[in-house]
Amino acid sequence: MDLDDALLDDVDALIAADTRQLLPMTASAGASIRAAGSLVTAEAIDRVVDDGRPHAVVVVGGGGSRAAGDILAAVAGSGSPVPVMTFGGPSLPGWVGPTDLVVAVSGSGRTPETLEVAAEAARRGCRLLVVSPDRTPLAHLADQTRGAVSVGVGIPTVSGTWRARTLMWSLATPLVLMAGGLGLVEHAQEAVDAAADELDRVADVCSPLRDSVVND
């Protein structure tokens, strides 16, 4: 696809070309992190921590939701005391069992594959953490599963719309904070705060209001 460089210096044309409003939603990533972090209660963290450190953390999600698990794996790093793995479904690996923590992540709370895996985890007696909007099928499944912990997430919107690909940071933040409680990530809250500040900085530097000559 050919790109007209002149478009980069025409703010009105650039904004008009962004019909999906991805630019403002991406620019609000820092705010999304802070909003998501404010929804992670100490009670929820304590409920996860009280069951002890799992043998493995298995994050299940599709698309941008799965990317949240990849972020957790990267933040935990190779030095994590337990392995952190991400799967897209449609089923759990055979070795996953009651000593493992399954984290079901869905920006819509309705992803069929994620719902199937979460239900399978419940049947196996796995520890279950659900990260999804409230009042969705996935959140309801957590409510009906003994011992499961559900963390609600707000969906960042611009003019009443939202895009799945912009939810990554909102979904990853609860995972990092929970991992901090389990001792898998050091200084988790500080890391989350620093990430939000850095994303704010990048959004400012890369703003369409800046001349393309100085826009990074």
Each model region followed by its residue ranges:
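Short N-terminal helix-initiation segments at or just after the protein's N-terminus
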Residues: 1-5, 40-48, 113, 117, ...
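Compositionally biased, low-hydrophobicity segments enriched in charged and small polar residues
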Residues: 1-9, 52, 148, 211-216
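Extended interaction regions within the primary functional domain
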Residues: 7-9, 189-212
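A short, well-structured juxtamembrane/interface segment
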Residues: 34-51, 205-216
